[in-house]
């Protein structure tokens, strides 16, 4: 059974909320790709719409939007998700996960694209430390 941590970022106030989802709510994410819109009800944000922006698998490999499917793939990267070059022209072979959410995915990053009537902090709880 799928189990994810969904990191929902609110672009208006800059806060990020981490929500653990499993069961039927987690199944709403299976098969979706980065860039897809998802109903916020899966994470407790009724009336909201979320866009999937990234994620990582059980080994910490990042999901890349330019790699198809759910499998891992070795790519030669000159920068972007999974590798930050330190000198001009530097390239590196890295292993990344495809753009589709699967059972191997452990974290999903999402941002709010459409707002509901209630405030995000009221729905998810404001965890001030």
From Swiss-Prot:
Q: Which residues cross the membrane?
A: none
Query: What family name appears in the similarity comment?
Result: Belongs to the eukaryotic ribosomal protein eS6 family.
Keywords assigned by UniProt?
Ribonucleoprotein, Ribosomal protein
Task: Establish whether keyword Cell membrane is in the entry.
Answer: no
A GO biological process of this protein is: translation
Could you tell me one molecular function GO term of this UniProt entry?
structural constituent of ribosome
**Name of the featured protein:** Small ribosomal subunit protein eS6
Q: Which InterPro entries match?
A: Ribosomal_eS6 (IPR001377), Ribosomal_eS6_arc (IPR020924), Ribosomal_eS6_CS (IPR018282)
Q: NCBIfam families, from UniProt? A: PRK04290.1-3
* Organism superkingdom: Archaea
Its source organism is: Haloarcula marismortui (strain ATCC 43049 / DSM 3752 / JCM 8966 / VKM B-1809)
Instruction: State the residue spans of region: Disordered.
Output: 53-88
Which is one Gene Ontology cellular component term of this protein? ribosome
Positions of disulphide bridges: none
What is the phylogenetic placement of the source species in the record? Archaea, Methanobacteriati, Methanobacteriota, Stenosarchaea group, Halobacteria
């Amino acid at each position: 059974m799928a189990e994810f941590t969904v990191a929902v970022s609110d672009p208006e106030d800059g806060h990020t909320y981490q929500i653990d989802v499993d069961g039927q709510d987690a199944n709403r994410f299976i098969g979706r790709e980065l860039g897809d819109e998802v109903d916020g009800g899966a994470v407790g944000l009724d009336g909201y719409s979320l866009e999937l922006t990234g994620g990582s698998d059980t080994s910490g490999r990042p999901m890349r939007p330019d790699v198809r499917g759910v499998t891992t793939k070795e790519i030669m990267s000159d920068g972007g998700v999974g590798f930050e070059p330190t000198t001009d022209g530097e390239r590196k072979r890295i292993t990344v996960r495809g753009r589709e959410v699967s059972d191997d995915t452990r974290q999903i990053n999402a941002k709010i694209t459409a707002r509901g009537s209630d405030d995000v902090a009221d729905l998810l709880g404001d965890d001030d430390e």
